[in-house]
Amino acid sequence: MKIIRNIARRPWPRIGGWLPVMMLICGVLASCSSEDESTAPLPDGKYPLQLTAEVAQPQTRAGGKDAWTGGEEIRVSLEGVFGNKTYVMDASGNASPKDADNAFYWKNTDEARVSAWTPDIESETDISDQSGGYAAFDVLYASAIGRYDQAINLRFIHRMAKIEVILKAGEGITEEELEGATVTIFGDPLTHSTAGLVSPGDQSDGEIKPYYDAATKKYEALVPPQDMTGKPLIRISIGSNDFTYTLSLIHI
């Protein structure tokens, strides 16, 4: 009886070791098979990158960019492909390559990230005078993941922080006095932008002349995100009086 029990138990360590090995091999084979099925090379120049685009955060930016009017150029990058290319928007929100040299084509069937930005500013920009508008540096950025067999929709967001000031009469100040008021925004008057990412220039605080929207009676200015904690943010000059606003905690 003792011999029979030993014989009965003896195969199980071998079988128990065999099954996990077999399952591991099957798992590896399944993974390889799945990868082969999901990623396959595509013929060169056959599947162009298809793009549509919209501007998110549709708050009014009279001096900036809220919608496509046609002709705007956006810079585009495709994950896995070296370099950036230029696409041109139409008024319907469709993007097409600027020319044949600026066309992206899918290399395989795998998903990839598409990033885009406009305007393409690669140097330090002076933003101290925005009285004529700020569209030239109203940086928009978008990113999305897609495949070769579908159009990719890009939702552009504004990268710069926007400051709005509305003046109202009251407490001894008349509408006539407000018409002659001067509004000054404090902050870094320089900005850097690279591939849709913005940052302050030299970090020095300066004065920015805002854009005035007569229709909404708003003073508007764009600034790169920066820490203004404990620093003056807005100065309003009415006649010989200056009113300065400083917020204790603010990161714009």
Model-derived features with residue positions:
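N-terminal secretory signal peptides that target proteins for export/translocation
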Residues: 1-13
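Sec-dependent N-terminal signal peptides
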Residues: 10-22
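Sec-type signal peptide cleavage vicinity
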Residues: 2-3, 17, 25-249
